[in-house]
Regions:
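Structural recognition of alpha->loop->beta junctions
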Residues: 131-150, 186-198
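A short helix->loop->beta-strand "cap" motif at the edges of active sites that frequently abuts
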Residues: 44, 161-165
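Generic structural signal for residues positioned in beta-strands
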Residues: 64, 79-81, 141, 187-190, ...
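C-terminal functional module detector
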Residues: 1-5, 21, 173-219
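Residues that form generic nucleotide/phosphate-binding pockets
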Residues: 108, 158, 202, 206
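A metal-dependent hydrolase metal-coordination microenvironment
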Residues: 2-119, 128, 135-137, 145-157, ...
Length: 219
């Protein structure tokens, strides 16, 4: 954190879904406008859309736009959040994935995207295993904080086995009408400007912190 400036904070969420493919995928409730409006109202500086296996160009006129999508078709939710993607990688392992398959996917994605991030590692028991994190490499960040899961055991295992991996936090919003799942988990990035290159550099260098707000049941 030695290069951090306490005056330069960008509030960001990179993981959220909108209606795509005729409403086939989860996120069908959200329109681009709804998602943008909800996060703008909460003061977010960077509002990312990460639709399943598709780059959403709704906000591409914004100078801070970073092409992003969530990769993965498999039934065990072994997904990757791809930030700074050049294109969408269509291939994936649909059913069971062993360690070599998971590593192969990360390696292939790394050739086509700036940041290929294991998403919600603890989402299902047969997805990313805690044991996997002893060996998996070729990624710089892990989505430790996710609106559905917190994966500190996965992160701790990666760090304890010599993998320098930084944290990222996201809502993984699928329905902005449910305010209890909007603005709960996100990333504060220490960067002088809301600029794609500066944001990604800061994430790569660990100049960011994850934020987790607890839900208060009687709010």
């Amino acid at each position: 954190y030695k290069d951090m400036n306490p005056d330069n904070w960008i509030q960001a969420n990179f993981h959220a879904h909108t209606r795509q493919f005729g409403g086939l995928t989860n996120g069908r409730v959200n329109t681009n406008e709804m998602l943008d409006s909800a996060y703008s109202a909460l003061g977010f500086d960077y509002i990312g859309i990460s639709d399943y296996n598709k780059i959403n160009y709704y906000d591409s006129v914004n100078p801070s736009f970073i092409p992003t999508y969530e990769h993965g078709y498999g039934i065990f939710k072994i997904h990757q959040l791809c930030i700074g993607a050049e294109k969408v990688r269509r291939l994936d392992y649909f059913a069971f994935q062993n360690l070599s398959m998971k590593q192969h996917t990360l390696n292939r994605l790394a050739k086509q995207t700036r940041l290929a991030i294991p998403a919600h590692p603890s989402f299902v028991k047969k997805g990313y295993l805690v044991e996997d994190m002893k060996y998996l490499s070729n990624y710089k960040l892990m989505e430790v904080l996710n609106g559905f899961r917190i994966s500190t055991a996965h992160w701790d295992t990666a760090l304890s086995n010599g993998h320098l991996v930084y944290l990222i936090g996201n809502d993984d919003s699928h329905d902005v009408n449910d305010i209890t799942y909007v603005g709960r988990r996100f990333t504060m990035i220490n960067a002088p400007e809301n600029n794609p290159e500066l944001l990604m550099q800061a994430l790569e260098n660990g100049n960011a912190v994850g934020v987790d707000f607890s839900v208060i049941s009687d709010e």
